[in-house]
Amino acid sequence: VSSTIAPLNSLVTYLAIGIVAVIGTAEVLAGTFLVGQLQAFIRYIWQINDPLSQISNLSAQIQAAFAALSRIVELLDEQEEIPEAMPVKHIADVQGNVQFEHVKFGYYEENLMKDLNVNVKSGQMVAIVGPTGAGKTTIINLLLRFYDVKSGSIKIDGVDIRDLPREELRSMFGMVLQDTWLFNGTIKENLMYSKLDASDQEVQEACKVAYVDHFVQTLEAGYDTVINEESSNISQGQKQLLTIARAFLKDPKILILDEATSSVDTRTEVLIQKGMERLMKGRTSFVIAHRLSTIRDADTIIVMKDGDIVELGDHDSLLEKDGFYASLYRSQFEGLDN
């Protein structure tokens, strides 16, 4: 409405001024009208235009408010997370065995995963590869039950994850992502977020194995150094090393890693890679891989394209197939187009 009112208001105003100016000038020349009276009429027209312009602006604000309100109502009408299964089950001693059995999933009516079958034994590494936007995080979202599978099941140590309390399920995982998050507080407080009752010695040991203790010790306040709200007083690489240390402190059985190390110097990148290798040792790991050189030893590689799983296997078998994975591999190491 405002997009119509505003130009229409301007058109009417300028037409009125033009008509008054022409007629008024003729009357002034005829001696029946004073120049001051003509100026007054034109000023009156401008004064009438002001409230009309305000109405137009108000209309635009009301429209924006209604648009925002409709989105809020739409969000409030969204179904909350599916209620927990009753009675819930528990895993007393998590081993880290993960099974995807005939998993089918898709957003809305679109089917992405059609029949995923993967058996991941405790301590094994699963790499998820594919171009940007291929849907690599979909598997992670299913593991953490941000979405439920349409059919089939995902099991941890033989227990369907839909039968586990969400809080218990998500506590089994440790995460190190490319987009790290640290909150406003001391380094020690940020690390202890994964284990609230950790001792100072445990915190320091976690930092040592994550190759970040030396950096922390060089700071004037050490582990009591306050990270500002934007985390801008430490580098991106240091943030990633701290999140690796936080994962060590939690000591989870299952890991989710995003091994990308963009925007860091070479030395820090090497430390991050070493830290992740240490972290994965003896733990079931799901790695969102961007550089295929880092996942050659993966027990299983899931290859995704356009949201669908197109290939599945280990590094050697996928190269032998000479399919999409082999094309990605050559594009990185031989400079060929895929």
Stretch-by-stretch model annotation:
Residues 1-42:
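A hydrophobic transmembrane-helix motif
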Residues 74, 81, 192:
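Conserved E/DxxT/N motif and adjacent residues on the DHp alpha2 helix
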Residues 13-20, 64, 96, 199, ...:
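Residue-level signal for transmembrane alpha-helical positions in Major Facilitator Superfamily
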Residues 4-7, 34-37, 44, 51-54, ...:
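DHp/HisKA histidine-phosphotransfer helix
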